[in-house]
C-alpha cells in the first residue's frame, strides 16, 4: 500500500496529501498523519483515496461515537476533535473567500459553537426495502453511494428520535406499502415530534392502524405526504400541538410545519441570530430588508429591536407562515412580507422595496448573485449581513460586493451548525467605507 503525509483537510473533510506532484484526497486522514491508502479513483491531476491504516496518528484524532461512522455518509468528521472541526471549517471559509473572491475579512469572528451531539432537530431519513440485506433499511445515504445505510442508532439526532430507529424499521416492514415509502421526514420542536411518511401509494386501513398505534406508543405525531411538501396531512392525532421553536432573547415564537425549511440546530440558530443582530445593529426608525426570509427567523428579531422589516421569500407558503408568525408575536405593524423569486432580482425589483438602511441576506446554497448584482445607485444599504451555507457562493458574491459595489468585508466567521460533518455555515458583514 502507498503511504502519504496529510497536509490539510478539504471542504469535504478529506485529507489532502501530495504524492509525486499529484494531489491525493484521502478519506479518513487528518493533518499531520502518515497513512497508508487505497486509490478509489485516479485522474490526471488528482486521486481520490481512502485511508486503510494510520501509521502515525494525530493528537486531534478521537474515537468516533457512532458505530456506523465510515459507512454512513451523514457524518464525515467524527474522528476529529470538535474544536478542531470548527478550526478546519474556519480555514475552509477563509480559503474560499481568498481563492474564489480574492477578499479577506478585516477580522475573524469567533466560531459559534453548541452541543456536538443530539442537535439535529430536522432530518430526512431514507427508507428502502432490501430483502437481501435483511429487510427494511432506514437512515442516511452511505458514503459515496445512493444506498441507504442501515442505522441502529444516530447520535446526532435527538436521543428519543435515535431510539426510535429500530422500532421504525419494524413498523415499515409491517406495512403493505413498505416498498413504496421512500422517506420519513423528522421534525422536532420543544414540545412535539412529527414523523412525516412519504407514501407513494394509498394506505390500507390496517396500515393506518399500525401507524396510529406507533404514534400512541411512542408519543409522536404521524403525518402522511402523498404528493409534494404541501400535501402533508395528520394521521394521528388528527389535531394536536403544532411545531414551534422559540427565540427567548427576542421574545419570539415561530410556528412551522414539518416540511417547512427551518434550521436543524436550534441552539446554533439562536446564537447565529444573536450574532446577526450584533452585526446588523437594527434600530427604531430604520428600514431593513430580510431577503430569503423564510418564515421570519431573522425578520421578527429585527422587528423586535424596533426596525421596520421588509421580508422577501420565494415560497408563498413560507410567506404566509411569516405573516402569521408576525401577527402572533404582535409584530405585524412593523413587518411586511412578499413572495418573489430572488434569483431573478434586478435593480428595479430591489428599488421597488423602497429605501433600505440595511440588508440581511440568508440564501440557500446557490447564493445570492442576482441580489448582490442588483445593489446599485437606487439601493445602497450602508450595511449588509450575509448568512451563508456555502463558502463558495459566499466568496463569489463577496467578490461582487467588494470589487464591483465598493463594500468592505469587515468580518466573517463560521457557525458550527452541523457538528461531525464538513458542512460550513458562516456569517459575514459588509459595510460601505
UniProtKB/Swiss-Prot annotation:
SUPFAM superfamilies to which the protein is assigned, alphabetical: Nucleic acid-binding proteins, S-adenosyl-L-methionine-dependent methyltransferases
Reaction it catalyzes: uridine(1939) in 23S rRNA + S-adenosyl-L-methionine = 5-methyluridine(1939) in 23S rRNA + S-adenosyl-L-homocysteine + H(+)
Residues that, per the record, bind S-adenosyl-L-methionine: 263, 292, 297, 313, 341, 362
A GO molecular-function descriptor: RNA binding
Binding site for [4Fe-4S] cluster: 66, 72, 75, 154
Active site (UniProt): 389
InterPro entries on file: 23S_rRNA_MeTrfase_RlmD (IPR001566), MeTrfase_TrmA_AS (IPR030390), NA-bd_OB-fold (IPR012340), SAM-dependent_MTases_sf (IPR029063), TRAM_dom (IPR002792), U5_MeTrfase_fam (IPR010280)
EC code: 2.1.1.190
Keyword Iron found: yes
Gene Ontology annotations of biological process type: rRNA base methylation
Keyword 4Fe-4S among UniProt keywords: yes
Keywords, alphabetical: 4Fe-4S, Iron, Iron-sulfur, Metal-binding, Methyltransferase, rRNA processing, S-adenosyl-L-methionine, Transferase
Domain TRAM per the UniProt entry, residue ranges: 1-53
Family per record: Belongs to the class I-like SAM-binding methyltransferase superfamily. RNA M5U methyltransferase family. RlmD subfamily.
Reported function: Catalyzes the formation of 5-methyl-uridine at position 1939 (m5U1939) in 23S rRNA.
Protein name: 23S rRNA (uracil(1939)-C(5))-methyltransferase RlmD
